[in-house]
């Protein structure tokens, strides 16, 4: 399966999960391809909080986002009145969410999320959607 098809499938999976959690949610049409404007992959809100989400998936290798991709997400979010979030999912794991400012920035100005970082530091789905919070081992 091509990475684009897999990414599209993962985006739809995230949209369905957010819908089941009570959010009004939509996948931005042609995000990243058929428009000159940079759009987030997913818009979601529950009447109290609104998110513009860039969704990325990987089999286990680190996930990279370009600096421009993250800057465009932050810009859109500010203008739209939403909170910018990066959603990452690794095979056989759940979704984890990050504020763009919490991501590791490479020397080249790109952003990176490793699987172990997502599992240790990412906000889990239940916490993100207002459910029970994740208990982290060794945390305060």
Curated annotation (Swiss-Prot):
The enzyme's E.C. designation: 3.1.21.10
Pfam families with a match to the protein in the record: Hjc
Matching Gene3D superfamilies: 3.40.1350.10
Active site as annotated: 31
Free-text cofactor note: Binds 1 Mg(2+) ion per subunit.
Keywords of this entry: DNA damage, DNA recombination, DNA repair, DNA-binding, Endonuclease, Hydrolase, Magnesium, Metal-binding, Nuclease
Keyword Metal-binding: yes
InterPro entries tied to this protein: Hjc, Hjc_arc, Restrct_endonuc-II-like, tRNA_endonuc-like_dom_sf
A GO molecular-function descriptor: DNA binding
Keyword Magnesium belongs to the record: yes
Cofactor: Mg(2+)
Phenotype when the gene is knocked out: No alteration in sensitivity to UV light, slow growth on mitomycin C. No effect on homologous recombination; double hef/hjc deletion mutants cannot be constructed (synthetic lethality), suggesting the enzymes play overlapping roles.
Catalyzed chemical reaction(s): Endonucleolytic cleavage at a junction such as a reciprocal single-stranded crossover between two homologous DNA duplexes (Holliday junction)
Site (Transition state stabilizer): 56
Family recorded in the similarity comment: Belongs to the Holliday junction resolvase Hjc family.
NCBIfam families in the cross-refs: Hol_resolv_Hjc
Entry function: A structure-specific endonuclease that resolves Holliday junction (HJ) intermediates during genetic recombination. Cleaves 4-way DNA junctions introducing paired nicks in opposing strands, leaving a 5'-terminal phosphate and a 3'-terminal hydroxyl group that are subsequently ligated to produce recombinant products. Has a role that partially overlaps that of Hef endonuclease; double deletions cannot be constructed. In the presence of site-directed mutations that (probably) abolish Hef helicase or nuclease activity, a hjc deletion cannot be constructed.
Protein name, UniProt field: Crossover junction endodeoxyribonuclease Hjc
Gene it is expressed from: hjc
